[in-house]
C-alpha cells in the first residue's frame, strides 16, 4: 500500500491556473522537506529536482476558464483529482493506494465523481506530513514556472514576481491594461473592472 500526499498552489491569485501535485515519497525521502511557503526559492528548486528525480509524482492543472466555470473550490478539487489520477497511472499493478493525505480540511472524496481513493484531510499538512510537503513544493514550483512563462506574453502584470497574486503592481497593470485570457473573471478585482 502506498501513501500519496497532495497539495495545491494558486487558489488565491487573480490570474493563472490552480495546480495540484500528488507525490509518493521515495525511501529514503529527500531531507529538508517542509511547507513550500517556508522554504527559500533556491531550496524549493533544489528539493523539487530531488523529488522529481527520486520519487513518483504528478500534477493536475486547471485553467482560469475552468476556475470561473466551477469556482476555485471546485477547480481545486478537480486539480487534486487529476494529479492523483495521473500518479496512479504510474503505480505498478500490485501497488494499491492505502491513503491519500490532503493538505487542508476537505478532500475531493464525495465532491468529484472520479475520486475513488481513501482520503484524509490534514490541516497544516504541508508542514506535518513529508509527502504533503513534497507535493506542496512540486505544485508551487510548477505553477510559478507557468506564471513566469505567461509573463513573457503578458509583461505588464509582473507575474514573474507576483505569480498572479493581487499585488499593487498587478492591480495597477490590470486597471491600465485590462484583463488577459489568463485572468480569473469570477474573482472580484477582475470582475469589478469588467463592470466599469
From Swiss-Prot:
Its main location: cytoplasm. It is found in: Cytoplasm. A divalent metal cation binds at residues 7-8, 103. GO terms for cellular component: cytoplasm; ribonuclease H2 complex. GO terms for biological process: DNA replication, removal of RNA primer; mismatch repair. Manganese or magnesium. Binds 1 divalent metal ion per monomer in the absence of substrate. May bind a second metal ion after substrate binding. Its cofactor is Mn(2+); Mg(2+). It is an enzyme of class 3 (hydrolase). One of its GO terms (molecular function) is RNA binding. It catalyses: Endonucleolytic cleavage to 5'-phosphomonoester. InterPro entries: RNase_HII (IPR022898), RNase_HII/HIII (IPR001352), RNase_HII/HIII_dom (IPR024567), RNaseH-like_sf (IPR012337), RNaseH_sf (IPR036397). HAMAP family: RNase_HII_B (MF_00052_B). This is Ribonuclease HII. It comes from Novosphingobium aromaticivorans (strain ATCC 700278 / DSM 12444 / CCUG 56034 / CIP 105152 / NBRC 16084 / F199). The lineage of its organism: Bacteria, Pseudomonadati, Pseudomonadota, Alphaproteobacteria, Sphingomonadales.
Amino acid at each position: 500500500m502506498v501513501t500519496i500526499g497532495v497539495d495545491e498552489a494558486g487558489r488565491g491569485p487573480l490570474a493563472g491556473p490552480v495546480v495540484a501535485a500528488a507525490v509518493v515519497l521515495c525511501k529514503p525521502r529527500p531531507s529538508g522537506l517542509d511547507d513550500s511557503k517556508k522554504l527559500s526559492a533556491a531550496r524549493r528548486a533544489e528539493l523539487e529536482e530531488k523529488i522529481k528525480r527520486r520519487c513518483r509524482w504528478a500534477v493536475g492543472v486547471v485553467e482560469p476558464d475552468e476556475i470561473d466555470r466551477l469556482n476555485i473550490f471546485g477547480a481545486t478539487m478537480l486539480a487534486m483529482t487529476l494529479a492523483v489520477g495521473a500518479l496512479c497511472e504510474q503505480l505498478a499493478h500490485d501497488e494499491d493506494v492505502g491513503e491519500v493525505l490532503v493538505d487542508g480540511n476537505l478532500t475531493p472524496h464525495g465532491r468529484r465523481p472520479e475520486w475513488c481513493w481513501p482520503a484524509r484531510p490534514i490541516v497544516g499538512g504541508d508542514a506535518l506530513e513529508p509527502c504533503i510537503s513534497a507535493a506542496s513544493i512540486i505544485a508551487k514550483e510548477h505553477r510559478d514556472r507557468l506564471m513566469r512563462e505567461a509573463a513573457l506574453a503578458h509583461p505588464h502584470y509582473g507575474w514573474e514576481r507576483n505569480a498572479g497574486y493581487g499585488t499593487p503592481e498587478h492591480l495597477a497593470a490590470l486597471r491600465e491594461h485590462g484583463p488577459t485570457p489568463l485572468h480569473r473573471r469570477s474573482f472580484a478585482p477582475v470582475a469589478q473592472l469588467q463592470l466599469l
